[in-house]
Amino acid sequence: MQITVLGAGAWGTAVAAQAALRHPTLLWGRDPAQMAEIAATRRNQRYLPDADLPARLVCSGDWDAALAHVSARAGTDADANGAGLVIVATPMAALREMLARIPQGLPTLWLCKGFEAGTGLLGHEIAREVAPQLACGVLSGPSFALEVARQQPTALVAASQHESVRDAAVRALHGASLRVYASDDPVGVEVGGAVKNVLAIATGIADGMGLGLNARAALITRGLAEMTRLGLALGARAETFMGLSGLGDLVLTATGDLSRNRRVGLRLADGQTLAQILAELGHVSEGVYSAGTVLERAGRLGVDMPITAAVVAVLQGGLAPRDAVAALMQREARAES
């Protein structure tokens, strides 16, 4: 099985390292110099400096070579194990471009989480627009890139309407340290991956303010309710949000100190400006970029998301963290739902 991973950030590098343990794998990045350095040092010094990469992982900045690697056997083997797989590991902002450039015959997964800025679309909706014939899906779940690259135990979910894509994801990545479950609810899996980033910022704010473990538990639980309401309005199944891509990813991102979104919340509570925080992080924090889009999409659907609304107000500078917490606590009493 031939695998190409498009995007040499931390997560793309980690997934490529896992895939290379079992299959011929190529990691592609936009910067040929960076890819040459990764190939020579077997480390991604910019995004994942603390993980050694397998010697058999091929690194390239050549787009044509990346597609040729995975196209060589796709569709030519009677044995399904010979089919190739493309894994898109770019930020959400580049997913549309990537999907439009991938040949329609190649099974494809994306790793990015969030709603597309401007359109408010999820990944599967973008795919429907730009590559309607592409067999594709999403790989998501509670996972920090460094732990995956170091082969620490992790469980993910591959969601697609195409059984061939789900099967390819399991064949490509399921192994001793990585379990991959299959799902046919990409909507639910994507909503979970998008909303948990915003909720992690909220939890980071609460923890940074020293509000205690009770407050953390309340935010995670009520945040899960927000996530589920939005997902149901978009056509997802409720049970998906109790799985890896919903509750699992939310708990990890909201409580794990490797989470960039959580760190944004912690620093906002400490009085730093958003500009200062993003400059210091140096990497993408999807929750910052997707929070407003999540709230806008929810508004169009008539879905109430008070925690998300509070995060957006803080990120936009219209509300201090302490005032946001006070506003949430002063909401009218209601039945739990």
UniProtKB/Swiss-Prot annotation:
**Which reaction does this enzyme catalyse, per its entry?**
sn-glycerol 3-phosphate + NAD(+) = dihydroxyacetone phosphate + NADH + H(+); sn-glycerol 3-phosphate + NADP(+) = dihydroxyacetone phosphate + NADPH + H(+)
Q: What is its EC number?
A: 1.1.1.94
| Localization, UniProt | Cytoplasm
- According to its UniProt record, this protein's enzyme class is oxidoreductase
Q: Which Gene3D superfamilies match?
A: N-(1-d-carboxylethyl)-l-norvaline Dehydrogenase, domain 2 (1.10.1040.10), NAD(P)-binding Rossmann-like Domain (3.40.50.720)
A molecular function annotated in GO for this UniProt entry is:
glycerol-3-phosphate dehydrogenase [NAD(P)+] activity
PANTHER family, per database record = GLYCEROL-3-PHOSPHATE DEHYDROGENASE, GLYCEROL-3-PHOSPHATE DEHYDROGENASE [NAD(+)] 2, CHLOROPLASTIC
Q: What name appears for this protein in its UniProt entry?
A: Glycerol-3-phosphate dehydrogenase [NAD(P)+]
